[in-house]
Curated annotation (Swiss-Prot):
Keywords: Electron transport, Membrane, Mitochondrion, Mitochondrion inner membrane, NAD, Respiratory chain, Translocase, Transmembrane, Transmembrane helix, Transport, Ubiquinone. The chain crosses the membrane at residues 2-22, 29-49, 61-81. It is found in: Mitochondrion inner membrane. This is NADH-ubiquinone oxidoreductase chain 4L. Core subunit of respiratory chain NADH dehydrogenase (Complex I) which is composed of 45 different subunits. GO terms for biological process: ATP synthesis coupled electron transport. The gene is MT-ND4L. GO terms for molecular function: NADH dehydrogenase (ubiquinone) activity. It comes from Mirza coquereli (Coquerel's giant mouse lemur). Belongs to the complex I subunit 4L family. Pfam families: Oxidored_q2.
């Protein structure tokens, strides 16, 4: 495994651990999720270019589209929660109430 793949995999696991450790704040969770999506994009691009799969060149672009949708929905939820409750602590909120 080349060193760039090891570094990207390490970045993914670091973002995953950050998401598990800093899950009390929504903004920290969103940043870690974006780091995970970025490392998945780079790793999938490298794998597709190394294996030369011509049929799956659109997969990283599709991953970026889903990452942009996830970021927009996450930021909209963050704004809604901070306007309603005045903070972004996830542990203090009961999001299942209507």
């Amino acid at each position: 495994m080349p060193s760039i793949s090891i570094n990207i995999t390490l970045a993914f696991t670091t973002a995953l651990l950050g998401m598990l450790m800093f899950r009390s704040h929504m903004m920290s969770s969103l940043l870690c999720l974006e780091g995970m999506m970025l490392s998945m994009f780079i790793l999938s691009t490298l794998i597709i270019l190394n294996v030369q799969l011509t049929m799956s060149f659109m997969m990283p672009i599709l991953l970026l589209v889903f990452a942009a949708c996830e970021a927009a929905i996450g930021l909209a939820l963050l704004v809604m929660i901070s306007n309603t409750y005045g903070l972004d602590y996830i542990q203090n909120l009961n999001l299942l109430q209507c």
